[in-house]
Amino acid sequence: MLKSKDSSKDGDGRSSSGTVTLKCKDLRVIQLEIPDMEETFNVARSVQALSSLENISLRYPFFYRPAGCKLGKGWPRHTMENFYHNLKAETDAWRLSDVNNNFKVCPSYPEKVIVPVSCSDTTLKRAAAFRQGRRFPVLSYYHPRNKMVLLRSSQPLVGPNHHCCEDDEMLLDAALMGQWRGFIIDTRTEQEAKQARSAGGGTENKNRYPKWSVFHRPLERGQALQSSLTRVVGACYETYLGRNHWLSKLQASQWLSHIKEALSTAGLAAECIEREGTCVLVHGEEGTNNTLLVTSLAQLILSPDCRTVVGFQDLIEREWLQAGHPFQVRCARSGWAHGRFQQESPNFLLFLDCCWQLTRQFPMAMEFNEKFLCTLATHAYSSEYGTFLCNSEKERYVYKIRENTHSLWGALNNFQQRKYLVNPVYERNALAIWPSVAPQSIELWEGFFLRYFVPTKHKEMSWQRTWELSGSYHRPGYK
């Protein structure tokens, strides 16, 4: 995060000045030249203490009070209720359950979840006991064209003794809605799933789930993924490297490979639903990281509603915030994190990078633009708003985030902000958008990783001219 060094010395050998280097969470590097060494150490200690606050209620969002803005704007977003309202218009086979009221069944789930109407709350509670963290299978997406669904959960607690749970089996069978088969996408290798079984976890036994077939599509996670981000950020800041050496360091970081695998796995889930006409369950271990990466990207591929500004915000609310992605520990130090932060992992940044790849491949399909994605990436790591605080809805309830902080969505949906975050050439596309994962199709997100090196003046001029030519200011919703 920071370091200090001497810049000069007096004749008696004592340091007379110093430099504090701040490596910020938005990837900026700031150097403070301080003439007095004692003051240098004071600044360093203060920044170190303020950057490592353990008490959530002492974070900046609790003290941020912009002029003219009232607390409560943008809160609450009834995302799950609105999602269910739209679902209800398509089918009556699913219900909105409050089995998790007061977070008493699963601490990382929201209070309301969507489940098959044929499954009682008692069944859900028993199924929860069979899943890691009690994250039982819930509906993530309903495909209106063929009525197939996308589900997510955590791994089953099969263990070395091959435990089973009839209620969990009943829940997954009910989700098929009479279909004769479904696919389970496990985001671990087969070997990792076997090792997890020896520790009490595992994956679904085909004898107990005969209608479900398991695919292992491993995605990097945890420290390995964080290390990849650290390497790509390090390469971007080594501006003295020659082109070939820089490209070799970029390749060695494996960041672009992780993007490829994420898009490929999400594309598989979407293909199973759209083209194969089958239901899909996605899980890894906890079901709070790569599981959410796959389900959210799959919805972006399939659903035009998720590609609008508001729809994308709802997607993040539903599939990341309310679904229990632990932002507080995963987004603690960004690309400068070191080994001390064992829980750091850039799953959400990887998701946003994949979204940017889709905006490149389908420049008219998304209503939001690159600046919108960069803004979200920045606020996920460091923000004056409370939207990305805490690790779950339960924690946000405990700390009264909605009552005591401002909402990022409320700020972004203000017209003065929103007009800079939308795509001037957006045209709604009702079809699925299938990403290419060919090597030439995946690029480094320069607008994020190199934004403090590459001049943006010409890009901004081009954006402004595109707005003028497209007449976007006169479209409905932009008045």
Regions found by a protein language model. Give the residues of each.
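Glycine-rich nucleophile elbow surrounding the catalytic serine of serine-hydrolase chemistry
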Residues: E285-Q299
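Cys-dependent protein tyrosine phosphatase-like superfamily
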Residues: M1-V280, S296-K479
